[in-house]
């Protein structure tokens, strides 16, 4: 009764036949892939707070996103929730996670995947080549060690896009949330061996994100330092288009030294300010442990674009994003590529990483209060609604400053906690029902009308939706869990077809009209031709960064597009010399549009970004 699968897809029966039906994670005595909590960005109120966790959350704020296949998207997610089995503090400080802060803990009793929402997802140990599926998270966790997967394994095709050394290594783990990819490669950072080390060191008891591979074999690579003060941390990224980024990191000691130099300069200047901050203590080290995990003090200071294949001789003279931190290593401020501060944060002096206030550029500050257990009890917004949160057994009461009250009733624990009844401010009640994996199977609205969702036993995909009137819409899927048909209550049917790479090649409407899609590039998901039901064809041409360069309609007229290095559209050229030109300020805001005759529209913005 060790929690290993009783019967998995691809296993052999006594008769020598393969098991091709059933879940990949049917366990004896233990669940698999269950998270310690619900997703922080799931149900939120106010600005925002997750009432099921009692946590202040910021589900995701993007600081950098240049276009391209497998782009490097740098985002930050915050949650004041603290898991009992945390990964180390990430590069944005306690409470924050970057996409590359994903970590896998390898323990004797199991595997713990720490996601970029600050949660812990628990899996049973995996044998080499084994794949486990979390029904509640719709996530696969795999271990390398085999050249190919059995043909009955839904991930067998996606497995083959991985580099051979990754597939064959039993020390590499992989995760994905889609049969079309991408794969997240969880390996360990290389390090320079010590002078007294004769043999290569054993892999550590954890894995970190070292790369991403999509269904076309394109890669996003995270380069980690092999030695020095920031050993093991991400110092560079190469995206799927070949761009290279440098991540400038600092240690707590380096930030403390910089602070002391700045303070000395300020105090020695006759006109220098004499503020309370001049005497602020900035320690050289941080406490080794926090409620958010162990902390090595390494922080991301700035991100630079160091190489762009489309602009090999031009590089930005300023970072694309910049960050500053408090003396306690907490993220204080975020600056965009123009050097403008766009975000600011304040934390509880007694609880490292507990956010008590934040604001956007030009906006008022939202403040938060917590109870003794670390749950948010109040949000105060000087120019909006305030909210109070009261926590009871299996219920949460949310009241705003207009005295409107909602009550959430919950069932389940941890990652399977769900809201099963909601009392709205107007007195109405809605209800929801879930299966044992936490997947929605029925909803009843305030008028008592019930909608039911039929789910596939293994995948959880919705196979039918039955409305309050008893009419049913049915959905069909292929082996890659892509929708292939929709059958409506009147008997009419629409359908979709895909190629071996999962790209849409044809879709037929309820009326029987078919639209077809063609692809010139076998390593791209972008269509180059669209043929409608009349036989008319449209053609598209794309840049290496996935931007539309030219569109030719069914009449043969072509529209061409131009972009700057940041992916912003700067010109549109239509037939007969009709062109439009756009320009942007350093913050990336549209400030001018001009036509071929010189007529111009100009735009201005407030500090908050309002037009």
Task: Cite the ranges covered by each PLM segment.
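Intrinsically disordered, low-complexity proline/glycine-rich segments
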Residues: 1-49, 221, 311, 315-323, ...
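A generic local secondary-structure boundary/capping motif
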Residues: 14-17, 62-63, 291-292
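Hydrophobic/aromatic beta-strand elements that line small-molecule binding cavities or substrate pockets
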Residues: 24, 62, 184-187
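Intrinsically disordered, low-complexity segments enriched in small residues
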Residues: 30-83
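Short alpha-helical segments and helix-capping/turn motifs at coil-helix boundaries
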Residues: 56-61, 97-99, 105-109
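Short, conserved DNA-binding cores of transcription-related domains
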Residues: 63-68, 72-78, 93, 97-101, ...
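Short, polar loop/linker segments at the starts of domains and inter-domain junctions
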Residues: 83-97
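Extended charged/polar low-complexity repeat regions
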Residues: 92-94, 109-611
């Amino acid at each position: 009764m060790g929690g290993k699968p009783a019967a998995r897809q691809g296993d052999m029966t006594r008769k020598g036949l393969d098991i091709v039906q059933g879940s990949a994670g049917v366990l004896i005595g233990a669940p698999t892939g269950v998270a310690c909590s619900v997703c922080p960005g799931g149900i939120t109120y106010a600005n925002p707070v997750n009432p099921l966790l009692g946590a202040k959350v910021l589900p995701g704020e993007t600081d950098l996103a240049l276009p391209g296949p497998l782009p490097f998207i740098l985002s930050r997610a915050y949650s004041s929730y603290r898991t009992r089995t945390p990964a180390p503090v990430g590069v944005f400080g306690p409470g924050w996670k970057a996409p590359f802060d994903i970590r896998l803990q390898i323990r004797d009793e199991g595997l713990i995947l720490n996601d970029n929402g600050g949660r812990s997802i628990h899996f049973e140990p995996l044998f080499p080549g084994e794949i486990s599926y979390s029904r509640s998270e719709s996530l696969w966790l795999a271990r390398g060690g085999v050249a190919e997967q059995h043909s009955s394994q839904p991930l067998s095709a996606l497995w083959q896009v991985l580099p051979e050394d990754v597939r064959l290594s039993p020390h590499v783990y992989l995760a994905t949330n889609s049969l079309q990819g991408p794969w997240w490669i969880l390996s360990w950072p290389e390090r320079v061996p010590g002078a007294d080390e004769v043999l290569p060191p054993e892999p550590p008891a954890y894995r970190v994100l070292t790369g991403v591979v999509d269904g076309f074999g394109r890669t996003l690579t995270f380069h980690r330092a092999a030695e020095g003060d920031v050993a093991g941390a991400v110092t560079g990224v190469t995206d799927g288009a070949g761009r290279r980024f440098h991540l400038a990191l600092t240690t707590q000691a380096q930030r403390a030294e910089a602070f002391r130099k700045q303070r000395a300069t300020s105090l020695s200047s006759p006109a220098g300010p004499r503020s309370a901050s001049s005497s602020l203590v900035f320690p050289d080290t941080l406490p080794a442990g926090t409620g958010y995990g162990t902390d090595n003090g390494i922080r991301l200071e700035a991100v630079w674009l160091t190489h762009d294949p489309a602009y090999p001789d031009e590089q930005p003279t300023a970072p694309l994003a910049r960050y500053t931190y408090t003396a306690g290593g907490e993220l204080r401020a975020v600056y965009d590529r123009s050097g403008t501060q766009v975000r600011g944060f304040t934390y509880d002096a007694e609880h490292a990483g507990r956010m008590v206030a934040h604001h956007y550029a030009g906006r008022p500050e939202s403040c938060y209060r917590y109870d003794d257990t670390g749950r948010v009890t109040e949000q105060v917004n000087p120019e909006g609604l305030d909210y109070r949160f009261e926590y009871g057994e299996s219920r949460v009461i949310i009241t705003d400053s207009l005295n409107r009250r909602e009550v959430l009733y919950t069932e389940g624990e941890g990652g399977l906690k769900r809201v099963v009844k909601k009392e709205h401010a107007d007195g109405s009640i809605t209800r929801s029902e879930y299966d044992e994996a936490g997947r929605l199977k029925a909803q009843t609205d305030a008028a008592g009308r019930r909608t039911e969702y039929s789910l596939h036993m293994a995948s959880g995909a919705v196979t039918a939706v039955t409305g309050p009137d008893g009419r049913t819409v049915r959905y069909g899927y292929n082996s890659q869990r892509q929708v292939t048909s929709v059958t409506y209550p009147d008997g009419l049917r629409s359908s979709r077809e895909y190629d071996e790479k999962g790209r849409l090649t044809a879709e037929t409407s309820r009326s029987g009209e078919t639209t077809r899609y063609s692809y010139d590039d076998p390593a791209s998901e972008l269509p180059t031709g669209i043929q409608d039901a009349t036989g008319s064809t449209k053609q598209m041409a794309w840049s290496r960064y996935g931007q539309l360069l030219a569109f030719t309609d069914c009449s043969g007229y072509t529209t061409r597009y131009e972009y700057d290095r940041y992916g912003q559209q700067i010109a549109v050229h239509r037939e007969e010399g009709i062109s439009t030109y756009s320009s942007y300020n350093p913050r990336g805001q549209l400030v001018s549009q001009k036509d071929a005759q010189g007529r111009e529209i100009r735009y201005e913005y407030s500090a908050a970004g309002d037009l």
